[in-house]
Amino acid sequence: MASVNWADDRAARKKFPPPSFYMPLLVSSDKAPYRVIPRNLVPIGKGNKDEQIGYWNVQERWRMRRGQRVDLPPKVHFYYLGTGPHKDLKFRQRSDGVVWVAKEGAKTVNTSLGNRKRNQKPLEPKFSIALPPELSVVEFEDRSNNSSRASSRSSTRNNSRDSSRSTSRQQSRTRSDSNQSSSDLVAAVTLALKNLGFDNQSKSPSSSGTSTPKKPNKPLSQPRADKPSQLKKPRWKRVPTREENVIQCFGPRDFNHNMGDSDLVQNGVDAKGFPQLAELIPNQAALFFDSEVSTDEVGDNVQITYTYKMLVAKDNKNLPKFIEQISAFTKPSSIKEMQSQSSHVAQNTVLNASIPESKPLADDDSAIIEIVNEVLH
């Protein structure tokens, strides 16, 4: 017969993941974390340039309210490649709750950075790019000081309460003595005047409160009508600017939304070189009349797909800058560098955007630019 050893509680212990070097981020969005976290969101401050690679581990959170489970915004914790709860995973190996990130030039081999010790405080993460509005740093709370703070607050409240009672009693006695003295003085003066023949027969009505006219209430100034937010517009009508940038309007750059370098993403149409790039963007009429348009039902919506191709001469002065913006978030290199890049095999695998291999333009006089635009209505 099997026996139970109550002294052995190892099976009942909850296994916690190794602590991260950094404070976690809170994902305050209805979107999945992998749709919000930029693919190059690696904290700065640890490791060399080869080790700027790792993953964000998603921590699902919930609480019970009236017997029902209520989901809370998830937190994400950063770990370098080869560390943390998923240290055995290879870079970009699929796993639930894992969002892979890396910087340009990082190597896809395990780092030697290890994990934070539990008695060390986590660092506040800092990044070389701006955090999307859906992400925020969760401040560290030292639980070891909670009891001392609670005791201090309790003592302060008790002292304040006793002091308040004592002060209140003293003020009450002072007011009572003052009122009694005033009454005695008024009675004595009145009696003296009466004995001298000054009997106040007619009392003038009190004018208290009537000598000072009340100022009419000024009407509140009407609030100035603010410019409508781009986020209130349909997605296909938004125009990103410095105030509401590309990430706010359309989300972070990824392989399905791959146009724009850091300047364009930050400033939108207010970026310095955007007017030149706009020369190679079809207008509404061209997109409508010169596209292959198709529709498809997606749940309660209709998906409208525009497939558009345009021929641009190779000597077009705006073409090099335009091509530079393609997947610029993964490989911010110039056109000349792309054209002069020689094919070679590196000894170590170096991360450099997993985009299709770039091919030279055709030998004819024009380049083909294909645009596929999908709109959910």
Swiss-Prot record:
Annotated stretches, region: RNA-binding: 19-151
Quaternary structure and interacting proteins, as annotated: Homooligomer. Both monomeric and oligomeric forms interact with RNA. Interacts with protein M. Interacts with NSP3; this interaction serves to tether the genome to the newly translated replicase-transcriptase complex at a very early stage of infection.
Function: Packages the positive strand viral genome RNA into a helical ribonucleocapsid (RNP) and plays a fundamental role during virion assembly through its interactions with the viral genome and membrane protein M. Plays an important role in enhancing the efficiency of subgenomic viral RNA transcription as well as viral replication.
Post-translational modification: ADP-ribosylated. The ADP-ribosylation is retained in the virion during infection. Phosphorylated on serine and threonine residues.
Segments of this protein annotated with the region Dimerization: 230-334
UniProt domain CoV N CTD: residue ranges: 223-337
Protein name, as recorded: Nucleoprotein
HAMAP family referenced in this protein's UniProt entry, alphabetically: ALPHA_CORONA_NCAP
Biased composition (Basic residues): 230-239
Transmembrane residue ranges: none
GO MF term list: DNA binding; RNA binding
Keywords associated with the record: ADP-ribosylation, Host Golgi apparatus, Phosphoprotein, Ribonucleoprotein, RNA-binding, Transcription, Transcription regulation, Viral nucleoprotein, Virion
Segments forming domain CoV N NTD: 17-139
Species per Swiss-Prot/TrEMBL record: Human coronavirus NL63 (HCoV-NL63)
Skewed-composition ranges (Low complexity): 145-158, 165-183, 202-214
Family: Belongs to the alphacoronavirus nucleocapsid protein family.
